[in-house]
């Protein structure tokens, strides 16, 4: 069996072909960073137009590298959401057309579930139960995984996601886009204790996240210290802000560990490429005597290999895909907390 996965939830146009043995025959990702850089963030209309321009090439190149034809595919998979609705519809419409023409199943995939599945691409035997921290530009969520394909939402962001907070501070300082990698590079030689940021935490015992207060505190520091690209303590400021974001992420994860008693921890999503976060995450896992799993950087950011992999797992376990033309995209988070 071979499955073609398509991912267009935000600003990467991606396609991948996986076998039922989870061997990646090809994976192509076309970034739009240069398109959105002048605006300091993703412009939804430009993103969807760029997907329209690129998707035919990306899928064709993916099939060429995999040395497979449409007739050689057994199923298709596509991200349904959450994400930018215009971008999602480009990928979904393209996948529907292929699946309907070839009379093959089309598996609809949730973007956050696909990010969790990315950990299994290289670590197929992760012990359960597990707690997964999904951190990306648009989402920050905690999940409890009782087993494969069985996840429960523990907490999510109430406002800005971690990646959004990093991007917005970078944009305010004129550091470039995408902001997260720029901040990481400039913060590498800084003192993370130079500027004090309070740990944001929701009321009661909630495991939800909120980064708007942290962002506001950073903007206040920028105003009070006249922080700029040329400020002598810019590296210290960025290191302190990055450290505060990481502490906030792992504080909730640590409380989830105490409450739900997992045997494994998973870190995934685009922000999981951050070296400081990866280091602190592994330190937490070691101190808690838990196994830790993080995808390789290439599988942290949006890609179609994780989409195809989740489809393979669903088909392997007997999950029946819906009717091709009935599938629809959804921009908002809809995973149940039950």
Which stretches of residues belong to each language-model region?
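Glycine-rich phosphate-binding loop plus the immediately following alpha-helix
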Residues: 124, 147-191, 215-225
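N-terminal beta-alpha supersecondary unit
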Residues: 2-72, 78-82, 111, 115
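Conserved phosphate-binding catalytic cores of ATP/NTP-utilizing and phosphoryl-transfer enzymes
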Residues: 1, 109-131, 310
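Glycine-rich phosphate-binding/hydrolytic loop that grips phosphoryl groups
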Residues: 295-336
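Conserved phosphate-binding/catalytic loops in two-lobed NTP-binding clefts
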Residues: 108-109, 265, 282-307
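A contiguous, well-structured pocket-lining segment that forms one wall/lid of small-molecule binding clefts
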Residues: 69, 185-265, 274-284, 288, ...
């Amino acid at each position: 069996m071979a499955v073609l996965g398509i991912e267009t939830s935000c600003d990467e146009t991606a396609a991948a072909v996986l076998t039922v043995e989870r061997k990646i025959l090809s994976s192509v990702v076309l970034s739009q960073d240069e398109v959105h850089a002048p605006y300091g963030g993703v412009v939804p209309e430009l993103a969807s137009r760029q997907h329209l321009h690129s998707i035919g090439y990306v899928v064709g190149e993916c099939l060429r590298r995999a040395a497979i034809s449409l007739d050689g595919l057994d199923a298709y998979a596509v991200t349904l959401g959450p994400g930018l609705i215009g971008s999602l519809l480009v990928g979904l419409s393209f996948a529907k057309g292929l699946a309907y023409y070839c009379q093959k199943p089309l598996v609809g995939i949730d973007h956050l579930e696909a990010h969790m599945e990315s950990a299994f691409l290289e670590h197929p035997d992760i012990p359960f139960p597990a707690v997964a921290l999904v951190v990306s530009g648009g989402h920050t969520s905690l999940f409890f995984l009782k087993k494969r394909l069985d996840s429960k939402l523990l907490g999510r962001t109430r406002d800005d996601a971690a990646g959004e907070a990093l991007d917005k501070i970078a944009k305010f300082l004129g550091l470039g886009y995408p902001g997260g990698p720029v901040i990481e590079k400039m913060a590498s030689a800084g003192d993370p204790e130079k500027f004090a940021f309070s740990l944001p935490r929701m009321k009661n015992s909630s495991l939800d996240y909120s980064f708007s207060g942290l962002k506001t505190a950073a903007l206040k520091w920028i105003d009070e210290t006249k922080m700029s690209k040329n400020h002598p303590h810019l590296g210290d400021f960025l290191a302190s802000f990055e450290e505060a974001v990481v502490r906030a992420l792992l504080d909730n994860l640590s409380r989830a560990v105490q409450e739900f008693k997992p045997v494994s921890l998973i870190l995934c999503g685009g922000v999981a490429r951050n070296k400081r976060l990866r280091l602190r995450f592994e330190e937490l896992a070691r101190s808690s005597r838990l196994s830790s799993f993080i995808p390789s950087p290439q599988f942290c950011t949006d890609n179609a290999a994780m989409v195809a992999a989740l489809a393979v797992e669903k088909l392997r376990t007997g999950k029946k895909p819906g009717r091709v033309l009935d599938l629809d995209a959804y921009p908002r988070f809809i995973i149940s907390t039950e």
